[in-house]
Amino acid sequence: RQLELHRGLNNYTQNSVRDAVKDIVGIQFRNLATVGGSIWGRFGFSDVLTVFLAMDTYVELYQGGRIPLREFVGQKPDQDILVRLVIKKTSGCFSYASVRNQSTDFPVIACAASVVGGEYRLSVGARPGRAMLLLDEEGLLSEGLTEDSIENFAMWAEKHIPTGSNHRAGAKYRSRLVRVLSQRLLNKLREEQKWR
C-alpha cells in the first residue's frame, strides 16, 4: 500500500508503480504484502517485480552484495537474505499495464516499458513464468519513438518473449497481448517525452 501512495516514487515513475499495485486483491492484502517478498519470490504473477524490472533497480543481498535486479531474477533461489531494494533515480519515463480476467485476479500478462538513460526496456511478467526484461538489442528504437518504430518493436517483442499456457490464458493469446501492450506503453512513453 505504501508503494501505491508514495508521492515521490509515483512522481518519478509517472504513476507506473501505483498502476502496477492498484489491482492487487484489495487494500487489506496490499497493507500486508511486502515488496521484499514479491521480489525475493520471483513469482511469475508479480506485478511488483515486473514494474521494478523496467527501472534502474538493484537488490542488496546479505552475502551476495548489490546486484542488478535483472541478474537477480535469473538466479536460482538460495538461502541469502534480501536486505533492500535500491532504485537509482536515473532520469527516465515509465509506463505499466496488465490484462486480467477479473479486476482482482492475477494478471494474464503484465508489461512495463521504460526509457532509462537512453536505453529502452520492456519488462513482461505473468508469461506465466518469471518476469523477464527485453532490451532493444536490434536498435529498432534507436532513432526515437515513432509510429513505425513502435510497431516494429512490438512485433519483435511478440516473437522474442516466450509465453506459455495455463488456466488463465493460452500462449498465443499472451504473445498477442505482449504486442498490443508494448505498443500502448511505448506510445504512452512517446507522449510523456513530448511533455519533458
Label each residue range with its predicted role.
Residues R1-R196:
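C-terminal structural segment of proteins
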